[in-house]
Amino acid sequence: MKGLFVTIEGPEGSGKTTLIQSLLPYFEQKEQKVMATREPGGIAISEDIRTILHKQEYTMMEARTEALLYAAARRQHLVEKVMPALNDDYLVLCDRFIDSSLAYQGYARGLGMDKVFEINRFATEDCMPSLTIYLDIEPEVGLARIAKDAGREVNRLDMEDISFHKRVREGYLQVVERFSDRIVLVNADQPMEKLIEEVIQVIEDKLL
């Protein structure tokens, strides 16, 4: 890989999507080859899997099914979109990657981080981000943001109770500790302008 693979992680309502939308034009103006994408999704097959995963009526979905669907979507997205871009020397900004599975399915769903990590090692052939930025926020604050965003479609995970979202954050904090060599924790409970500045500095430090 010649490019730089940067993933943005965080609980629901942490501001990942808004952040990436702001980072994209900044790096384009710097004449950096840059691409934004998301998980699950980014390509047709993975977007179809995303639809299944997010359907509100699929509350009966079992945790292992959920974990495997995310891994399947990740595999196709990686080989079809991310890897070609990295090989073409792009800065790839990805909304979620493996760490989401570790926090949500591994920890919050109780499948075990090691088991979920092994599933994803198989799916990605050990491809890991060069840098991960974790946007940390209290679940109550993130969910309140979602409730105020009339344009955001509520998905199946949003409907989980507050205890689930608290476990997700606990899981993320464990992931940050486990992979401290590549993950930078950033406080997401601050004005977006300041958040953008802080994240740009982190990425540029890595680029240099």
From Swiss-Prot:
The keyword Cell cycle does not apply. One of its GO terms (cellular component) is cytosol. Its EC number is 2.7.4.9. Gene3D superfamilies: P-loop containing nucleotide triphosphate hydrolases. Keywords: ATP-binding, Kinase, Nucleotide biosynthesis, Nucleotide-binding, Transferase. It catalyses: dTMP + ATP = dTDP + ADP. Pfam families: Thymidylate_kin (PF02223). GO terms for molecular function: ATP binding; dTMP kinase activity. One of its GO terms (biological process) is dUDP biosynthetic process. Phosphorylation of dTMP to form dTDP in both de novo and salvage pathways of dTTP synthesis. Belongs to the thymidylate kinase family. This is Thymidylate kinase.
